[in-house]
Amino acid sequence: MGYVKVVKTSPYFSRYQVKYRRRRQGKTDYRARLRLVRQDKNKYNTHKYRLVVRFSNKNVTCQIVYSTIQGDVVMAAAYSKELPNYGLKVGLTNYSAAYCVGLLVARRILTKLNLADTYKGQEEPDGEDYNVEPVEDGPKPFYCLLDTGLKRTSTGSKVFAAMKGALDGGLDIPHNEKRFVGYADKKLDTEVLQKYIYGGHVAEYQETMQEEEPEKYQAHFSSYVENEIEPDGIEDMYKEVHAKIRENPCPPKKERTKPADAKRWSPQAHL
């Protein structure tokens, strides 16, 4: 038998340092988080805001967050499950829906800070890269950083669709057009990006499947069939959703009903 070096010795275990809980669970990249959270030493009591974008199987979440010693504070949040209130009932996790959620959280935070009329953003997205310009006599635009978490930042990722929606909504986010869908050969194809914002890629696939595999189309696009959404009407549908989001980004909350009086049951004494 060959020589086997003993690695995990008593000194190894005595010096072993347990990693943070969320690192052990594989939920947080603390190296990236430190660079997103740490503020300059000469900016006293100034928050560093982040646009947090997360994806699940059925939902897209966008939040405006800043960190404190006690924990993170969420200033505004938007979810794709809210989009049916604005007229979008299908495809709540695709590229176009991620754009809508980013637009919604941007308009929501600017409305909360009374900046919605000052910074309206790109009201009619044309696929061009948009950067908000500060007004001369007024407050600066709301500045935040994109927090992608553990999501891989590949070109064309839905993370950047949410960021594009927030940019067009009027937020100031440092970015590069290289990560938007349609970027190839060192230039951005604005027509491709505009097509994805308005769901054109879904409409194309819908038309192809209707012609080639009608039976599979009924199953794959069952929610579209149920809501009577045809490929020709998808672009107009998304335009209406964008307009409704800008019109009322903060719908009134439902009033909570008064809870019923708690009944107390005391055991009966048995003789």
Swiss-Prot record:
**Looking at the keywords, is DNA repair present?**
no
**Superkingdom in the source lineage:** Eukaryota
One Pfam family, short name: Ribosomal_L5e
Gene Ontology MF terms: 5S rRNA binding; structural constituent of ribosome
Gene Ontology cellular component?
A: cytosolic large ribosomal subunit; nucleus
Q: Provide ranges: composition bias, Basic and acidic residues.
A: 245-264
Localized where? Cytoplasm; Nucleus
| Protein's GO biological process | ribosomal large subunit assembly; translation
User: Which Gene3D superfamilies does this UniProt record tie to the protein?
Assistant: 3.30.420.100
Q: Where is this region: Disordered?
A: 245-271
Record keywords: Cytoplasm, Nucleus, Ribonucleoprotein, Ribosomal protein, RNA-binding, rRNA-binding
Per its UniProt record, what InterPro entries does this chain match?
Rbsml_uL18_euk, Ribosomal_uL18_C_euk
HAMAP family in alphabetical order: Ribosomal_uL18_A (MF_01337_A)
Which PANTHER family does this chain map to?
A: LARGE RIBOSOMAL SUBUNIT PROTEIN UL18, RIBOSOMAL PROTEIN L5-RELATED
Please state which protein family the record places this protein in: Belongs to the universal ribosomal protein uL18 family.
Tell me the subunit arrangement: Component of the large ribosomal subunit (LSU).
Q: What does this protein do?
A: Component of the ribosome, a large ribonucleoprotein complex responsible for the synthesis of proteins in the cell. The small ribosomal subunit (SSU) binds messenger RNAs (mRNAs) and translates the encoded message by selecting cognate aminoacyl-transfer RNA (tRNA) molecules. The large subunit (LSU) contains the ribosomal catalytic site termed the peptidyl transferase center (PTC), which catalyzes the formation of peptide bonds, thereby polymerizing the amino acids delivered by tRNAs into a polypeptide chain.
Its protein name is Large ribosomal subunit protein uL18
Q: Which organism is this protein's natural source?
A: Dunaliella salina (Green alga)
